[in-house]
Amino acid sequence: MYPQGRHPAPHQPGQPGFKFTVAESCDRIKDEFQFLQAQYHSLKVEYDKLANEKTEMQRHYVMYYEMSYGLNIEMHKQTEIAKRLNTILAQIMPFLSQEHQQQVAQAVERAKQVTMTELNAIIGQQQLQAQHLSHATHGPPVQLPPHPSGLQPPGIPPVTGSSSGLLALGALGSQAHLAVKDEKNHHELDHRERESSTNNSVSPSESLRASEKHRGSADYSMEAKKRKAEEKDSLSRYDSDGDKSDDLVVDVSNEDPATPRVSPAHSPPENGLDKARGLKKDAPTSPASVASSSSTPSSKTKDLGHNDKSSTPGLKSNTPTPRNDAPTPGTSTTPGLRSMPGKPPGMDPIGIMASALRTPITLTSSYPAPFAMMSHHEMNGSLTSPSAYAGLHNIPSQMSAAAAAAAAAYGRSPMVSFGAVGFDPHPPMRATGLPSSLASIPGGKPAYSFHVSADGQMQPVPFPHDALAGPGIPRHARQINTLSHGEVVCAVTISNPTRHVYTGGKGCVKIWDISQPGSKSPISQLDCLNRDNYIRSCKLLPDGRTLIVGGEASTLTIWDLASPTPRIKAELTSSAPACYALAISPDAKVCFSCCSDGNIAVWDLHNQTLVRQFQGHTDGASCIDISHDGTKLWTGGLDNTVRSWDLREGRQLQQHDFTSQIFSLGYCPTGEWLAVGMESSNVEVLHHTKPDKYQLHLHESCVLSLKFAYCGKWFVSTGKDNLLNAWRTPYGASIFQSKESSSVLSCDISADDKYIVTGSGDKKATVYEVIY
């Protein structure tokens, strides 16, 4: 009559029955809560699987779009070739005898009659050849029908050469990875079944469904990776190899639409030292760069005629940037695409859709911007339960106990460990390319700092207890002023003592007095280079009386700031069309300039002459720093190398090779450590003698500038992801993080370590006060 699970009535005197105790009720509530928690966890896992599946489907869509676009181009190309050959034949035929003319005309007509049977036979033969090639390379292939759906393809226009080759390549790629994919699926299915058998709270049907979804996601993932590699190879034919480092441009992403564009050679800076195509003969361009406020994937145009912002097809690079439909917390999404007539070498233009193939699709966060400037100490109360956070994010925990203890001692909140801008919905994706076992530490806190040993072994860094405490370590930074420069700010520097800030944009440097709160206009403007050329670097001599400016021109301008009105004291002319970075020796006698041709020019400032050139970089030299004692120089280049130079002997000392272009670097004033900012979004901290290094993973896109504090205990980096990150030297504990509204291209720290200035793509510089 009553349900079996009905709770017993309270015990009354004189009646036999169970004793009512609070402990039993609490246990029952606890059991029910654990059951609900397990159900919630399984639903969360299923939701994550579906989200991953959706991501992979979107990538597949992009991949097929890219493939169809490529085939369409190839078809038009082959059609045009056929028309031209026809014209040539028609012109040559009259020179033949009458008899030969008829034979040739008949042969031409026969050649035009390609039937579907012949076409299918040709495709079948190509697939057979692909199978033989696959057999020779990867062992016996898995049989594959001529068409992915098992049907014969519909009529295709008769094409020759590389178009049919592309079809064969597709068939080969599909067959080559099927066997590997199936084997991996079996392993993963077994693993999921073993996992589900140990989970009492999930029903068998749920386990089976989860394993099926897991296998489907693995299929998508393997296929997407393989197809990305195939597309990169097959589409590279559309690119020429002529792109070199002097073709670097700046994209003013926030420029008013009504403003007429200047010559294509002076397009504004896009983030990440992107190289431009076809601009070599027009003008030097340069490596810093600027992005849109919504961090849309940058684009590269093949044709200068398509240099319009809103219509340029193309793609940026392998750097992960958020999709336009998923704005980062605290930023406003700007409609429209930001075009960028530049690219790093080896990137292939096929359409803006292609960039999503190389771009993780992020989900929006529900956490707003105010978290951006909170210190980690203030954030530690958020979601401190390790099991709650691990359950929420389905995070694997295979880290060492030492790392766990260190993380607990460090006390970094889960939210801040992704940057104080909200949760990352897929923590293991945060550290790009890392195995899932390295993506988090016990307790569900994602790792972002890793120690890389000499043999390449990567381990999360256990932070010491004083990682965020102690003398000279800031707690956070607060924004105190905004300097509206009016153009993209590619270079900033602060005077010593801290009073003036110099901001370099298009064709001029503006001087601001930050000692007066609320100052909204510059006190002076230094017009240099050409009006449309961007300034890439400006450096003050230690006495504060001389400013050296370099950028998209072959000349460096030396300004005398001590005169009643600043004036040009001298100009230094080099053979390179652009200067990307400057450094001044501690004794202020020598200036070093990074040239777009890869050379490092050494200038005697007293005699205003070129005294030496360091040659070694095979592509543009993009960044530079000098040791505190003035004996060693460090340079980074677009040739993926960092080199050190002995200034006394004038020779190269060391060379570090990377897999990514180098956009920024800084040498610790106290010696030993060199921090390097990559196009791949990593920051790497190298020891000047030991092979060990640290790898830091909080940026989501190109790391565009980097600067050490003068005490050497911390440094800051800025990126295309709109972030300013402050790191502990050398292991990279995140001290604080600030989110700006656009790409942050440049930064500087005052000599007393009390102020930070950044220059960004939304035409302003921002002054921060460092709070200790």
UniProtKB/Swiss-Prot annotation:
WD repeats lie at residues 484-522, 530-569, 574-613, 616-655, 657-696, 698-737, 739-771. Residues 200-268 are annotated as: CcN domain. Residues 269-452 are annotated as: SP domain. Disulfide bonds: none annotated. Keywords: Acetylation, Developmental protein, Differentiation, Isopeptide bond, Nucleus, Phosphoprotein, Repeat, Repressor, Spermatogenesis, Transcription, Transcription regulation, Ubl conjugation, WD repeat, Wnt signaling pathway. There is a cross-link at K720 (Glycyl lysine isopeptide (Lys-Gly) (interchain with G-Cter in ubiquitin)). Residues 130-163, 184-347 are annotated as: Disordered. One of its GO terms (biological process) is Wnt signaling pathway. The modification Phosphoserine is found at S203, S207, S211, S217, S240, S245, S263, S267, S286, S317, S413. Residues 197-207, 284-299 have a biased composition (Low complexity). The modification N6-acetyllysine is found at K232, K275. Transcriptional corepressor that binds to a number of transcription factors. Inhibits the transcriptional activation mediated by CTNNB1 and TCF family members in Wnt signaling. The effects of full-length TLE family members may be modulated by association with dominant-negative AES. WD repeat Groucho/TLE family members are characterized by 5 regions, a glutamine-rich Q domain, a glycine/proline-rich GP domain, a central CcN domain, containing a nuclear localization signal, and a serine/proline-rich SP domain. The most highly conserved are the N-terminal Q domain and the C-terminal WD-repeat domain. This is Transducin-like enhancer protein 3. The gene is Tle3.
